[in-house]
Amino acid sequence: MSVPLILTLLAGAATFIGAFLGVLGQKPSNRVLAFSLGFAAGIMLLISLMEMLPAALDTEGMSPVLGYGMFIIGLLGYFGLDRLLPHAHPQDLVQKRQQPLPGSIKRTAILLTLGISLHNFPEGIATFVTASSNLELGFGIALAVALHNIPEGLAVAGPVYAATGSKRTAIFWAGISGMAEILGGVLAWLILGSLVSPIVMAAIMAAVAGIMVALSVDELMPLAKEIDPNNNPSYGVLCGMSIMGLSLVILQTIGIG
C-alpha cells in the first residue's frame, strides 16, 4: 500500500476519534445537542466560504461564471432535495412538545452526514493526489484534514446518539463521512491520480460548498435554535468556526495553505 493512500486513510479515520468523543458518557441533553448542531454549522460555513469556494475560484482555468454557477447549483440542488423529502421542519420539533422528535433529529443528522461526506470525498482525492506529487506536502495536508475531521465526527455522532440512544449507530453514521474521504483516496489511487482534472475538481468543490451552506442555514442552525432558544447554539457556531479557522491557520503556517 502506497504512503499517499495510507495518509488518506489515516486522515479519514480521524473522524472516528470525534465519533467516540460524541458518544462518551450519558445521552446528550438538548443543550448539548443544540451546541453540536451549531458546532457543525460553524464548521460547514467556514470550510465552504473560506476554503472550498475560494480554492475552486482560484483554480487555473476556472472562470468566475462556472465557479459561482456551480455554487448556486449546489444551493438550489439542496433546496430542491429538501422539498422532495417529506420531513418535520425545525419549528415542528417544539410544537406541543418539550423534547425534539427523534426522527427529525435523525433525519437532520443523516443530511449532515451526507453534506460532510460530499465534502470529504473530493478532499480524499485531493489529499492523495497532493501526497503523490509531494510527500512532505501530503503529510501537512493529511494532518490538517485529520484535525478538522475530528470535530466533524463529533458533530455527526452527537445528534445521531441523541436521536437513537445507540452508540454503535452514532459511530456508524459518523464513520460513513470518514469513509467517504477514504473512498475518494482509493478512487484516486485506482486511477493513479493523473486523470483527475483540476477544473472538474474545482467545479465539484464549488457545488459542494453551496450544498453545505444551504444545509447549515436551512437545517442545522434553525433546528439548533428551536431545540435551545438561548444562546447555546450561537456558541456552537462560533466554536465550530474557531476550530476550523485554527486548522486553516495551521495549514498556512506550515506553508501549504
Swiss-Prot record:
Disrupted-gene phenotype: Mutant lacking this gene is impaired in its ability to grow in metal devoid environments. Mutant lacking znuABC and zupT exhibits a severe growth defect in zinc devoid media, is hypersensitive to oxidative stress and contains reduced levels of intracellular free zinc.
Catalytic reaction(s) noted: Zn(2+)(in) = Zn(2+)(out)
Residues reported in the UniProt entry to bind Fe(2+): 120, 123, 149, 152, 181
Keywords: Cell inner membrane, Cell membrane, Ion transport, Iron, Membrane, Metal-binding, Transmembrane, Transmembrane helix, Transport, Zinc, Zinc transport
Pfam family, one: Zip
Induction: Expressed at basal levels in rich medium. Expression increases under zinc limiting conditions.
Biological processes, Gene Ontology terms: zinc ion transmembrane transport
GO MF, any single term: zinc ion transmembrane transporter activity
Family annotation (InterPro entries): ZIP, Zn_transptr_ZupT
Topology in the lipid bilayer: Multi-pass membrane protein
Transmembrane segments: 5-25, 32-52, 61-81, 109-129, 137-157, 171-191, 195-215, 236-256
GO cellular component: membrane; plasma membrane
Binding site for Zn(2+): 123, 148, 152
Family designation: Belongs to the ZIP transporter (TC 2.A.5) family. ZupT subfamily.
NCBIfam families: PRK04201.1 (NF003243)
Its job: Mediates zinc uptake. May also transport other divalent cations. Contributes to zinc acquisition during infection and plays a role in the ability of S.typhimurium to colonize the host tissues.
Protein name listed in UniProt: Zinc transporter ZupT
